[in-house]
Amino acid sequence: MEVTADQPRWVSHHHPAVLNGQHPDTHHPGLGHSYMDPAQYPLPEEVDVLFNIDGQGNHVPSYYGNSVRATVQRYPPTHHGSQVCRPPLLHGSLPWLDGGKALGSHHTASPWNLSPFSKTSIHHGSPGPLSVYPPASSSSLSAGHSSPHLFTFPPTPPKDVSPDPSLSTPGSAGSGRQDEKECIKYQVPLPDSMKLESAHPRGSMATLGGAAASAHHPITTYPPYVPEYSSGLFPPSSLLGGSPTGFGCKSRPKARSSTGRECVNCGATSTPLWRRDGTGHYLCNACGLYHKMNGQNRPLIKPKRRLSAARRAGTSCANCQTTTTTLWRRNANGDPVCNACGLYYKLHNINRPLTMKKEGIQTRNRKMSSKSKKCKKVHDALEDFPKSSSFNPAALSRHMSSLSHISPFSHSSHMLTTPTPMHPPSSLSFGPHHPSSMVTAMG
């Protein structure tokens, strides 16, 4: 069949108004936009010529099979240019579209017939010949392009609107049922999905959130972090700052008192630890330890406290006859000697010569141990810290530098860093960045 003069009206770039469904006479009374009247569909011969003509009008060999031609007879071209496979957009004012049943085989290219398992993109990347509508197995859109939900349901037309019998032919009834079965086969029923959500509400929401994020952004994202504290690993009291019952150590009272218990030796009724003697009687901790170490009962009368070595009246050194010393010692004979003579005899095994006697007592400043010195400096620094007038980073760095020999984090006043994602999605917008991404020690 030769190309007539009226056939270029089916070419997409000559009459975009007709192909886009904008002509006032081509609207179907029962459908939305982008639907043409079936009476204006092209004949099979015209479609054959349409697909066998290249851009310059030359006749080329047939590229598509009979199944594609049969499909084109039921679908009018709806777009101009190379993107002729884009489905028509349904009007937003159709209140009867709900997620109950599938539309039908003649609306296979509608964006409502979605399948979450489809991998076919709606835009072709190759500049070669393009099909008007792909087959039924690849006609559904990807779920990530249209909706972030995992389960989608096609809309249901109202009962009073019946499909036009002219849109479907008797020969295409079998293929229409097959397409409808394929659309329903990949849809998950609602009760199963609700069972999954009701079983684990937090886990299902986290799974849906992760699926939506991976569908919208092709770049790999991190899974959402939803801590599950209801598993019983950590008791609820640990979340509120209290000490867990199974992990914290209870502070024992210093004195245990129980009714009916009394030390048989001293009569005490409260003690840190109750002990027993050989006969099974209760003893307080002091009497029990004394009996264990000495083998006898602890004496109830306290011995008189000895006077300090410097205040012993009438005591003099047997070697140098001094009466003042910091510590009284005894020589081999048992006589009292001063501290200087006693140390000298202990070191040299001879009596200290009298020429070394001095009027005053020589004392030396003992150096503090490194541990006690560090503890003292930390205590002084903590006392001076609240006295600072302002809590700015400069003052904080000065205080941290004073603790440089103590704290392992003293080389910098910033100790905590904020985590940053390795691969941020390209479509996400972030707020203005601060000059420093560190968190100071003040929080």
UniProtKB/Swiss-Prot annotation:
Modified residues (Phosphoserine): 115, 162
Gene transcribed to yield this protein: GATA3
Record protein name field: Trans-acting T-cell-specific transcription factor GATA-3
Sequence motif: YxKxHxxxRP, positions: 344-353
Any GO molecular function: DNA-binding transcription factor activity, RNA polymerase II-specific
Pfam families: GATA
Stretches the record annotates as Flexible linker: 288-316
Keyword NAD in record: no
Zinc finger (GATA-type) residue numbers: 263-287, 317-341
Gene Ontology CC annotations of this record: chromatin; nucleus
SMART domains (UniProt xref): ZnF_GATA
Entry function: Transcriptional activator which binds to the enhancer of the T-cell receptor alpha and delta genes. Binds to the consensus sequence 5'-AGATAG-3'. Required for the T-helper 2 (Th2) differentiation process following immune and inflammatory responses. Positively regulates ASB2 expression. Coordinates macrophage transcriptional activation and UCP2-dependent metabolic reprogramming in response to IL33. Upon tissue injury, acts downstream of IL33 signaling to drive differentiation of inflammation-resolving alternatively activated macrophages.
Xref: SUPFAM superfamilies: Glucocorticoid receptor-like (DNA-binding domain) (SSF57716)
Assembly, per entry: Interacts with the phosphorylated form of TBX21.
Organism expressing this protein natively: Bos taurus
Main localisation: nucleus
Entry domain remark: Binds DNA via the 2 GATA-type zinc fingers. Each zinc finger may bind either adjacent sites in a palindromic motif, or a different DNA molecule allowing looping and long-range gene regulation. The YxKxHxxxRP motif is critical for DNA-binding and function.
